[in-house]
C-alpha cells in the first residue's frame, strides 16, 4: 500500500489536486481542529467561487501566499430604508455603499453608542423577569434591545474586518493549510500496517475509485498531470484515515459536493493589483457572523503532542501572572505596588505569600477557545466549552494550607486527581463569607459577582491592561475625556466593601471599563481595542450566571410585609361591610397601590426607601458624580449614600464598617419597636452622614490622586510588554494551548528563576522535581483525561436525573427561565450556565507540557514491539483455526490434577463440606422447633427457603484457569500473573482443607505472598548450594536436607508425619464425625411411637380429626378414608405431614415449657368465682355420677382434717356436729396445711457433725412477752382481734379500732383463721391499724 504513494508528489505543489483534496476535507469538517472560526469563514468563501477556472487560479495564488483580502461590510436595511427602496430601487444600491463608508469613518461613534446602550438595556432586559411590567414598557424594552443588538452586531463586524484584512491573515492561513495537508500525508505514509489490516477498508475502495476517475480524465490530458493524479488519489486515500480525528461530525458529505450554505462568488470579486497580487473582495454581513462557531477544544488537545514548547512565551506570561498577584496583594493589604524589576527578583517566600493572599475562584468558568468570536448566528457570544484550570474556590479558603501540603506530597498519594477532588469537596465550607442576616440576597449576589470578577482578572491574555487605573503619565488627557474611570481592581474593592445592592450596579461598572477603553482609543487599529472587545464578550458570557437579585434590608422587608398584611385585613373588613350592605366591592385607589407594591416589592424596593426619606433627595443630588447620573432611574438615593460612605472607608481596615453595621442593626431594632421614631432617626442619620461624606470624600480624592502619582512612577514601563505582537493569533492550536497552560508555565518559569541569583547559579535553590505520575506518554495522559471527563459527565447526568425524580427540576428550570429570559433567541441551551458545578473535573496543565515526556528528545526504537490490536487479531485468527479444525487438547496445566496429594486434599474438603451440610440440616430442624420461626416460615415461605439454603461448593479441577495460554502468542512459563493465579488456587484449597469456609481476598492474597516467598527461598537456597564452588560440595540428598534445615524443617520425617496426620488420620476422623452426625440426624427425623402424646400435636393440627398421624407413621388407615375413596376429596392423605409437626416438641425442654405456657394464668382465674360444694349437694346427687365417688372421697378427707384440727379445742362436740350439717363445704386443696418433715442433717465436707452452731445476733431476735395465753382465751373465748373480719363486715378496705365481734369457730368460709387454731398451731398476732 505504501509503495503506491510516492513521496515525490509532495515535492511540488499541484494546485488542482490539493484543491480537490481540500474540498473533501472541508466537507468532512476536518479543518475545524486546525483553523480558527475566522479562517474557516475565509476558506469557505474561497472554495465557494462559482467559476472553476477562477477558483483554481485563486487557489494557486493562495497556496503561494500571493493574495490579499479586501473586506467590506454590509448591513441589512431598516424599515424606513426598505420603504424608500420599494419606491426607488436605485437608491438601494447606493445606500449600502454609503452605509459602509459611514461606518468606516464613524467607527468610534458606533462603538460608544453600542456600549452605552448596552448598559442601559441590560436593566430593561433583566426587568423582563417580573410579571408586573406593563405592556408599554415591554414595547420600549424591545425597541431598545434591538438597538443594542444592532450596535453589537456592527461592533463585531468591525472587529472581524480588522482581523482578516490585509496580507498577514491570508498568508498565515495559506501556511496553515499547507501544513495540514502535508501532515496528513506524513501520518499516512509512516503509519504502521500489518497483515491484519489496521486501516479501514474504505481506503482501498476510495483509492480505486479515485484512480479510475483520474485515469479516465488523464486520457485526454497531457502526461504532466500524471503526478497530480497519483498524488490526488493518494491524498484522497489518507484523508479517510484522518476521519478519526473528527469523531463529532455527524454529516458525511459526498466528495464532489461543494461547500454548503454559501452564495456563489462572481469573478468580479477577483482582481490583480499593481504588485501582482491577487485581491479577493469579500463582503461580510450579519450572516457571516452566524458562521463563526466554537471549536472543539478536547479534540484540539489530541494534537498537542506535536507542539514543541520553549520558554520564549513564558516571560510575558510570568509578568502578567505576577502583575495579577501583585494586584491581589494590593487589594488585600492596601500596599503600593512594586516595580517590575522587583517582581522578577522576588524570593520564594514572597511568592508564597502572594499565592496565599490571592483570592481563588470557586467555579471553573468557560473561556474562549482561541477565538475572539464564539457565537453561532446570534448577537450574543456563545459560551465556550473550555474549562480553565482553577483552584477549589473561594469556599475553600480555610483549606489552603491543607491543599498546599497535599500538592507538595501529591506524588505519594495513591489516588487519582478525580478522586482527590471529590474527597476534598466533601469537607468544604457550608457558610460563605458574604453571608449576612440583615441583608437578604447578599450571599447569592456577591458570590456570583466575585466569581465573575476573579474570572475576568484571571483571563490574563486580555485582562492585564484593565487591572488598575490608567496612569496619568501614559495618558495625561484621559480624565478629561473619561468622566468616570473604572478598572477591575476598583470593582473588586467595591465588592468587598459591600457597595453593590443589585446586579445592575455591578454590570454597569463592568461594562463601563470596556466603554471607556473604546471611547478613549478611537483608532480602529489600536491594539487595546482588541483586548477590550475580547473582555467585553467574555463579560457578556459570565454576566448570564449572575442571578437578578436586589439586596433588601430585613427590617424594611418585614415592615412591607406587615403593611401588606394590614392592607389585606382592611380589604377583608371592607368586603364584609360591602357584602352586608348588599353592594359590590369598590376599588379603592390606596388599597390597589398597596397591592401592586406587594406584587413587585422586589423590583421597586428602592422606591419604598425613597418614600421614607424624601427630604434627602435634594441634598443627595450634589453628592452623585456626573458619571452616575446616567444610571437607571430606579436607583435609590440611599444606595448612593451607602456607596459614598463605603468609598470613604476603603482604607480604614474595616473598623468604621463594623460600627456602621452596628448602627444599622440598632436602628433596625428601634424601627421594629416604633415605626415613626425609627423613620425620623433614619432621616437624621442620613443627613449627618451626607455632610460627613462630603468632607471625607474630598480628602479621599486628594489621597487617591497622591497615590496615583506615586503609582505612575512605578508603572512607566508596566504597559510596554503589551505592545508586543502576538504572532500566534491566527494559529488555533498554539493560541488554545497558550491559554490553557498559561498558569502552570508561569509557575514553572518562576521556579526556574530561582536557579539563578546575581547572574550566577544559586546552589541553595530547591530542585524543580517532576511528578512521577505525570511522566507518561502523551497518549496515556490524554486517554486518562478523557476517561475522567466521561466519568464526571456521567456523574452529573445521574445527579440531574435524581434531582428530576425528587421534583426539584421544575424549580430549577423556572429559575433559569427567569434569569435567561432575554436569551431566548440564543442557540445555546440556557441551562448550561447553571448546570456548571464547582466540582467539575479540572484540567491538569502539566500533562500537556512536553517537559514531562521523558522520551521526546530520544529517537524511537526501530522495533516498538507488537501492537495490542495486532496481537488481539492474531489471537482471534488462532482461535478461529482451532474451532474450525476441532482441536480440543487438554491444557498442560491439568496434567497433574489426579496425581500427588491433590485427590486426598479434595477428599478432605469434600468430607468437610458434607459435615457442614449435615450440621446445617440439624440447625434448621432446631430452628423449626421454635414457634416463632414456624410463624415466619408460614408468612413468607419463599424468603425462609432462600435464606436457609446451604451453598454447597464443588471443586472441579478440570477447569482451566487460563485457556488462552494455549495459544502460541503467550509465554506461560514467564507469565507472573498466571503463576500467581495457580498459587492463589492452591493456597485457597489448603485453607478450605483446614476448615475455613470463607475468607477475605486480602487474607488469601497475603497467604499467597507468604507461600510464594517461602518457595522462592527454598529454590534460592538450593540453587546456592548447587552452584557453589566449594571443595566440600555435598550430594544431592545432603543439599536437600541442608536446604530444608535452613528454611525451618529439621528433618524429612517432619514432612512424612505431616502428610500422615493430615491425609491419613484426619480423613478417618472426618469420616467418623460424619457417621455420628448422620445417625443423630436420623434419630431427630424418626422418633418412636411410644414417645407420642397429645403434646406432640398443636391446636392448629388436624391429625386427630383426619387420622393422618397414623397413616404417615405406621401406614395404617385409621379412619378408613382410603377404603371409602375420600382421599382425593378431602386431600388429607395425599399431602405429606409437615416437617413442623414431626419435629416440634419431641422430648425437648422447649416443648415442656411451651405446654406450661398454655396453662390458665393467675390473672385470668382470679376474676372467676366458683360455688363451693356442700354436703347437701352431694347427698342430693347434683353432680355427674363419675365425679360423685371423687367428691365423696374429698368429703371424707375434709371431715377427717377438721376433726384432727379440733381435737385440742374445748368444743369438740360442736365441731363434730358441724361437719354433719348439709351446709358444710368441702375444703380446697390449698386449705390443707401440710406439716413440714424434718430435713436430714447434712454432713459438712469434712464428714463430721459439728456441734458448734452459729448464734443469731440479739439485735435481730424477737422476744415474746411473758403472758398466759390460755387464761386469756378462757376468760373471753368469744372475743378476738381480727382485722380481716372487721374489714369484711364493714365493707370498707380501711381498718378501724372496733369492738371485737363473736365469730363461729367452725365457720367454713374462714375455717383456718387464727381464732380456729388450736394449741398445736403456730402463734400469730393481728393488730388493727389506725387510720392516719
UniProtKB/Swiss-Prot annotation:
The modification Phosphoserine is found at residues 88, 1293. It is found in: Nucleus. Keywords: Activator, Bromodomain, Nucleus, Phosphoprotein, Transcription, Transcription regulation. One of its GO terms (cellular component) is mitochondrion. The keyword Transcription applies. It holds the Pfam family Bromodomain. The keyword Transcription applies. Residues 80-118, 209-268, 331-384, 566-724, 1286-1332 are annotated as: Disordered. The modification Phosphothreonine is found at residue 78. Residues 106-118 have a biased composition (Low complexity). Residues 234-249, 345-360, 566-578, 698-716 have a biased composition (Acidic residues). Residues 217-233, 250-260, 593-634, 644-697 have a biased composition (Basic and acidic residues). InterPro entries: Bromodomain (IPR001487), Bromodomain-like_sf (IPR036427), Bromodomain_CS (IPR018359), Histone-fold (IPR009072), Spt7 (IPR037782). One of its GO terms (biological process) is protein-containing complex assembly. PANTHER family: TRANSCRIPTIONAL ACTIVATOR SPT7 (PTHR47343:SF1). Component of the 1.8 MDa SAGA (Spt-Ada-Gcn5 acetyltransferase) complex, which is composed of 19 subunits TRA1, SPT7, TAF5, NGG1/ADA3, SGF73, SPT20/ADA5, SPT8, TAF12, TAF6, HFI1/ADA1, UBP8, GCN5, ADA2, SPT3, SGF29, TAF10, TAF9, SGF11 and SUS1. Component of the transcription coactivator SAGA complex. SAGA acts as a general cofactor required for essentially all RNA polymerase II transcription. At the promoters, SAGA is required for transcription pre-initiation complex (PIC) recruitment. It influences RNA polymerase II transcriptional activity through different activities such as TBP interaction (via core/TAF module) and promoter selectivity, interaction with transcription activators (via Tra1/SPT module), and chromatin modification through histone acetylation (via HAT module) and deubiquitination (via DUB module). This is SAGA complex subunit SPT7. It comes from Saccharomyces cerevisiae (strain ATCC 204508 / S288c).
